Amino acid sequence: MNNTEFYDRLGVSKDASQDEIKKAYRRMSKKYHPDINKETGAEEKYKEVQEAYETLSDTQKRAAYDQYGAAGANGGFGGFDGGGFGGFDGGGFGGFEDIFSSFFGGGGMRNPNAPRQGDDLQYRVNLSFEEAIFGAEKEVSYNRESSCHTCSGSGAKPGTSPVTCQKCHGSGVINVDTQTPLGTMRRQVTCDVCQGSGQEIKEKCPTCHGTGHEKKTHKVSVKIPAGVETGQQIRLTGQGEAGFNGGPYGDLFVIINVLPSQQFERNGSTIYYTLNISFVQAALGDTIDIPTVHGAVEMSIPAGTQTGKTFRLRGKGAPKLRGGGQGDQHVTVNIVTPTKLNDAQKEALHAFAEASGDKMVHPKKKGFFDKVKDALDVD
């Protein structure tokens, strides 16, 4: 067995945190539980998951496993050089004592009957551009592990109760003796009868089959504050999955996703808008109604405005989540060049070019009246 097999059984990496290992164990344990999964080989997989978790959940045993593999985790010392204890500091036996104590249960065991909080959940909610700016209230619906309504989470058939496990006497662990080159060593492992709960269910609940949990659709109202952005999270305490041994529910993390706007763009509390104007408006100036999320605002365009010029509408942006106040809206001018001109428009532009002293590459085409003058030879 290599030094990553236990991690592979739980589907986590070798540098996984204890919290990640615990969540993976719960997930895999439910997946292969014999009372839920009737497929061939599920029970064996379940035992392998228990074995992996029993080692990786204990800091000292995990350290021994990472360094020496299964032999270290199970009490063997293969890998030591015959001439001494290579790898340990010659000034003391601190590292050896840590590993040695894990074989004898020196590190202690957690109370298997202690209440444990349920798993956290995530839910992604879509908001319109305006909802993200002004805030909203959304009702979200999702499936979660809830306390079984039939047995109230005990896992036992109504009218019955779990009893103290006869094998481990309620401790959740049993002692196992292992023969090693150093003699018989005793270590503690999770009880294979009660799976570490310390209690044995003789008559299982017909609804949850002894797990104490059942899948239910849950609805909750979420208040979205004004000014949120994509990727931000809102934590709803107690809206996650049911706990264990009477422990509290986990939390729900609502992840915000803001849908794009057809008119505006946004960065933090600043909103951006592109204003298309004509050459005439840019040259002569104009007063234009500018759309904002707060309603139309009248803005003056000075004569001679160039493409790319940006104006600021103060207080017309999004709320600032931190520090309070309101952001601004930036209006950037884009001068639109017409693609289709009628004869009158062309005449006017040619006249403008002549008045400006611009030299045209292509000479002005004669109009109808010019042609009449030429025909009559009129000056």
Curated annotation (Swiss-Prot):
CXXCXGXG motif repeats: 148-155, 165-172, 191-198, 205-212
Domain of life: Bacteria
Keywords of this entry: Chaperone, Cytoplasm, DNA replication, Metal-binding, Repeat, Stress response, Zinc, Zinc-finger
Residues the record lists as binding Zn(2+) 1: 148, 151, 205, 208
Zinc-finger as UniProt keyword: yes
Binding site for Zn(2+) 2: 165, 168, 191, 194
Cofactor(s), by name: Zn(2+)
Pfam families given in the database record: DnaJ (PF00226), DnaJ_C (PF01556), DnaJ_CXXCXGXG (PF00684)
Compartments where found: Cytoplasm
Principal location listed in the UniProt entry: cytoplasm
Cofactor notes: Binds 2 Zn(2+) ions per monomer.
A GO CC term assigned to this protein in UniProt: cytoplasm
Record-linked PROSITE patterns: DNAJ_1, DNAJ_2, ZF_CR
Function: Participates actively in the response to hyperosmotic and heat shock by preventing the aggregation of stress-denatured proteins and by disaggregating proteins, also in an autonomous, DnaK-independent fashion. Unfolded proteins bind initially to DnaJ; upon interaction with the DnaJ-bound protein, DnaK hydrolyzes its bound ATP, resulting in the formation of a stable complex. GrpE releases ADP from DnaK; ATP binding to DnaK triggers the release of the substrate protein, thus completing the reaction cycle.
Family per record: Belongs to the DnaJ family.
Protein name: Chaperone protein DnaJ
Organism (species): Streptococcus agalactiae serotype V (strain ATCC BAA-611 / 2603 V/R)
